[in-house]
Structures are given as structure tokens and as C-alpha cells.
């Protein structure tokens, strides 16, 4: 199972980083941290004047597709997203399978004003402090990778640090975890992280089970304005899109098309 492999690798990396930069060191650096987390919920909530909120992803590679974009400049890509009207930016920081780096958060934060999501396999509070230090405004918490207790504890610590979390689900069991934890933002990933199979009907199946008042994000397999319109009718507020944008020559124009602005 690829998810198990990634989590195993993440744990090994964490042990090294904790020795190199102990939590006490990270905690001290928070006192000098210039990055104050920016509001996320109001940015992602669908509104009449901006119904299709976009979380545009900075992603060089993936385990299923390999390298997606050869000419990879995270800051230049982020600027294209800003030009296209994206509402937030997702930054892959997992190094082995996605060729991401946590420094990308800081680099992008210096140049674009939108909230930044640290997209990684977060299993430890240490990673949440890291996210804050490097400039993230919200983090991804994958329900499938965490127990109910772990998810709740990590979510509450995220809030304690002043950040927000996108809690990702793929089935009813994940949704129960997310509701138990008190998630405000719930992401439905159409892709199964264990098999990489895609099920675009998942949003339609799971949205009716989500309590009112939650911000709903659709993830994976989205590549057209028509899809965005239909999913929005079902109750989706925001759309996390990565690979489709990463394969474009004119990223800003494609973001506008997805939003229906071009």
C-alpha cells in the first residue's frame, strides 16, 4: 500500500528532523516568526460573487504520475495562480514521492498574498509547528492516515497554533472521524490513496452526510468549468486542483477558465 509506505518514510524523516531541529528550537523560533496565519474559512466559502473557490496546487511530481512539470519554479507558478484568480495555494512539502520541500512555503509566502496550505502526510504535532514557522496558514490532515483520537488531537493543536486544517476524507468511516474531531473544512478526495483509483461520484454520495455549516472542498480529477459548476450545485465550496494546472503552458488562463472568468 503506497499510503503505508509514505507514512513509514515520513516517520523516519521526522526522527531525523527532530534530532536536527528539536521541538524546543522550533518553538523558540516561533517567538520571532514573521508569519501570522491568515483567515482561511472566509476565503474558501462559496459566495454569490465568487462561487467557485480554487485551491491551486504547487506540485512537481506524484507517486502515480512521476514528474508532472519539468520546468518547476514554485514562486513563478504561485504568481500565475494569483494572476488567474486562485483563492488559496496548496504547497506539496513531501520530498520523496512528490518532490516537494517545506522551504517552498516560505518562498511563496514572500510573493503572494493568498493563504497557503501545507500539503503533506501530517502525523505529528512537530509538523504543525514546522508548518507555522515556514509560513502555512492551514494544513492537510488525512483521516485515512490517522486514528480518530490522533485526528482530534492534531486538529485541536492546529487551532491552538492559530492555523486551520483541511481534513481529507474518502469514505464514510473517514467522515465519521472528521465529524468526531470537529473539522470545519472537509475535503472529499475522489482518489483512493491506497489504490489510486478515481471515483468522481464520491462527492455526490458523501455530501448529504456532512453536517450543515461545514466548508466542503472537492479534490482530484477536476479539470473543467462544467465539473466545478455541477459540484458546486451539490454543495462544494472550493476545488483543490493540481495536476491539471501543472500541465498547462498558460496557467493563469486555465485557472480563469475553471472559474468561468475566461
From Swiss-Prot:
Pathway annotation: Amino-acid biosynthesis; L-tryptophan biosynthesis; L-tryptophan from chorismate: step 4/5
Which residues span the membrane?
none
What is the species of this protein? Nitratiruptor sp. (strain SB155-2)
For this UniProt record, give its keywords in alphabetical order, as a comma-separated list.
Answer: Amino-acid biosynthesis, Aromatic amino acid biosynthesis, Decarboxylase, Lyase, Tryptophan biosynthesis
Q: What is this enzyme's EC? A: 4.1.1.48
CDD domains cross-referenced by the UniProt entry: IGPS
- Among the Pfam families in the record, one is IGPS
Q: Name one GO biological process term.
A: L-tryptophan biosynthetic process
Q: What's a Gene Ontology MF term here?
A: indole-3-glycerol-phosphate synthase activity
Report the sequence similarity comment from the record.
Belongs to the TrpC family.
What name is this protein filed under? Indole-3-glycerol phosphate synthase
Catalytic activity annotated for this protein?
1-(2-carboxyphenylamino)-1-deoxy-D-ribulose 5-phosphate + H(+) = (1S,2R)-1-C-(indol-3-yl)glycerol 3-phosphate + CO2 + H2O
